[in-house]
Amino acid sequence: MTLAAKLIVLVYVALCFVNESTSQDHSNIYHETLTSLHHKGEFHVKGLFQTPVQYAGDETVLDLYVKKNSGGDVKAVYCLGNKRSIMNQFTDTGTTTDGYDLWRVKIESTPEHISRMISHGPIACNLIWEKVITPAKGNVAEIKGLDLVNFNVNFPRQSTDNVVSRPSTNSQTVDKLLNDTLAKARGVPMSVSVISGICAIILVIFPIFITIANLRRVYLH
């Protein structure tokens, strides 16, 4: 084989290698699968990983697209197992041209989460939804209440994999989630239920101490 032929073969092999590497990188970096999650006809959620978890640093960015079909507003998006508070974990980046609210959620990339995501295991997430109920009759003002939507996030291995799916069971309740996370985000050291319990104990024990003190005073005199 002549020197020119050898050079042509080497260039061809190099181009094939570069093309294969680029294709693999592109398929690993961009996951644009959008899986819709409907919730009682009020809204639906689509999930999108822009960067793979194995290439991420401390956090993996997940884009959640939420379209509202009724009154209300999304107050927070939270993925369980994350050390960040609710208020610091998500970013509202505005509304897209097709009517979706884009929420950028940062999922903590610990070794446990990386292993779970790569093995296509679900990460449990919650969406806190402030529902607005307009009474049908009368001049009663709008009623607002919180609703918690549970869903799973899966890191896709191929374009047909679901990013967002329904959980098998509800792992959290609104009260527990708000007490455990929102209170910490606002700097409240204890939940309302704990404070109420302490106050109740004090109210029961305090009269007993007063009675004992009075009896001791009478006995000494």
UniProtKB/Swiss-Prot annotation:
It comes from the Viruses. Glycans are attached at residues 19, 179. Residues 1-23 form the signal peptide. Residues 213-221 are cytoplasmic. The chain crosses the membrane at residues 192-212. Keywords: Glycoprotein, Host membrane, Membrane, Signal, Transmembrane, Transmembrane helix. This is Putative transmembrane protein ORF25.
